[in-house]
Design a protein with these regions (language model features):
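N-terminal glycine-/serine-/threonine-rich phosphate-binding loop
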Residues: 1-9, 30-42
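Solvent-exposed alpha-helices and their adjacent loops that cap or buttress functional pockets
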Residues: 2-3, 85, 131-136
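Structural motif
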Residues: 9-12, 143
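Glycine-rich beta-strand-to-loop/alpha-helix junction loops that act as flexible
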Residues: 11-16, 53
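Short, solvent-exposed loop/turn segments at secondary-structure junctions
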Residues: 18-20
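Short glycine-enriched, charge-decorated loop/helix-capping segments at active-site entrances
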Residues: 23-29
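Ligand-binding beta-strand-loop-alpha-helix segment within the catalytic cores
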Residues: 46-115
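Glycine-rich, aromatic-bearing surface loops/beta-hairpins
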Residues: 91, 95-159
């Protein structure tokens, strides 16, 4: 199903993996800026809210626009992501969004994982894999997902 305007797109990205290093070892601000620009272009085109996952040092908190947090009732946390505590893409997002804030948890409708950063904790309950024609960005493996409402009921239920 096509994304709907107002939905949330979560992205986790290891720029270390993108440039061919192990996750968390060699972040790249240059790669982060290029990736963020591409993500912003796509999310703007489709009217989606972008949420960028920080690294495990910030408990995988997320950088997003204050407007998204207000709409979805996400609670803000007090932290400023930087390259070595949050990740390069999170730092770029924080410095680039109109009104950037950091939140601890969300339930996104769609997701893209660049470099196996493990975004599953921020997706809605029923996750459906999306097969992409492009399997990598640089040296980083791409994994994409969408979500759907859970099916409830038993043998009498109609969907």
């Amino acid at each position: 199903a096509a994304p709907k305007p107002g939905q949330v797109f979560v992205v986790g990205c290891s720029t270390s993996e993108v440039i061919g290093s192990l996750i968390g070892t060699a972040g790249s601000m240059e790669a982060a800026q290029s990736i963020f620009a591409a993500l912003l272009k796509v999310t703007s085109k489709h009217g989606l809210y972008l949420a960028v996952q920080c690294c495990e040092h910030l408990n995988r908190s997320l950088v997003t626009e204050a407007e998204a947090a207000e709409k979805y009732c996400w609670e803000e946390v007090a932290v400023k992501p930087v390259a070595h505590a949050g990740g390069s893409l999170a730092q770029v997002a924080y410095n680039s969004f109109r009104q950037a804030i950091v939140v601890e948890k969300i339930s996104a409708h769609l997701g893209l994982d660049i470099g196996q950063t493990l975004i599953g904790m921020h997706l809605r309950r029923v996750v459906v894999p999306v097969r992409l024609s492009q399997k990598e960005i640089g040296a980083a493996v791409l994994t994409a997902a969408r979500t759907r409402p859970p099916y409830v009921g038993g043998e009498r239920a109609v969907y």
